[in-house]
Amino acid sequence: MFMEREFCCTRDGLTIRGTEYREDSERQGRCPAAVLCHGFGGNRYDLLFYAKELAAMGYAAYCFDFCGGCVAGKSDGSSLDMTIDTEAADLKAVLDYVKGLPYTDENHILLMGGSQGGYVSGIVAAERPDEIERLILFYPALCIPDAARTGTLGGAHYDVNRIPEVIRTFGVPISKKFHDSVVDKDPFSQICGYRGPVLLIHGSEDMIVNVSYARQAAEAYENCGLEILQGAGHGFTQEQREKVIVSVRRFIKGRGE
C-alpha cells in the first residue's frame, strides 16, 4: 500500500500543485525521491503509472502540474506565459521543495520526464548535475527548437518572419515568448552537461518527435542507455509501459548504465 498527499510550492508568486506517492509504512530513515514531469498540454496524471511503480520501489514520487503547461492542471498561471524557461523554473522549485522534506534523501533524487517534460528535465539535470542521481527520459521533445525555426511549434503553422503574438497549437495556445525562448537554442548543448546515468526510451514510430532526436541525444550524453521501443509512438500503451517499467527497474538497480 502507498499513500497519496497533495503538495504545493511556489515560483515567482505562482503556486505549483502536485501529488506525492510513497509507501505507507513505518520505514526508518530517509527515502529516495523521484520527480516526474509531464509533457506539453498534459498534467500530473500522465506519468501516474510510473509514480506508483516508483513508490512501490521505495521512492517518494512527486507528480505536478506545470504553471500554464496544461489544460486540466491545478497550478497557477496561463499558457500564454509558459515557456521552456518557466517550466525549468517550476521544476527547480519542486526539486527544492522535495529536497527540504524531512523524509527524503537529497543525495538520491531521480528525475523523469516525458516529451516536453523530458526536454525540461534534461535542461535542469544539466544545470543542477550534482543534485540528480539518475535521469529517465521518455520521447523527450528535443525537436522544439527546430519546430520554432520552421514555424511548426505544437503542430501549428505560422510565418517565422511574422510570428503571431498568440500561436494556436493543438490543445494549448502559447505566445510569441515561447517561440523566442527556444528558436536559437541547441537542445543537445543544453542537456549534455549532465554526466550521470541516463535512460532514454523512444518509440520507433513516433510521429511527433522523430527517433533521430533520441539517437543524437544518446550521442551527446556521456552515460546514456538508449532503448528504441519498436512499434511505439509518442506515448506508450499500457502493454508498452509494462515493458518500459522493466527497463526502469533495471536502470534503478544500476544495471542499466
Give a label for each model feature.
Residues 40-53:
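The serine-hydrolase catalytic nucleophile loop
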Residues 31, 39-42, 204:
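Active-site glycine-rich loops that stabilize anionic/oxyanionic intermediates
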Residues 1-27:
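N-terminal cap/lid segment of alpha/beta-hydrolase-fold proteins
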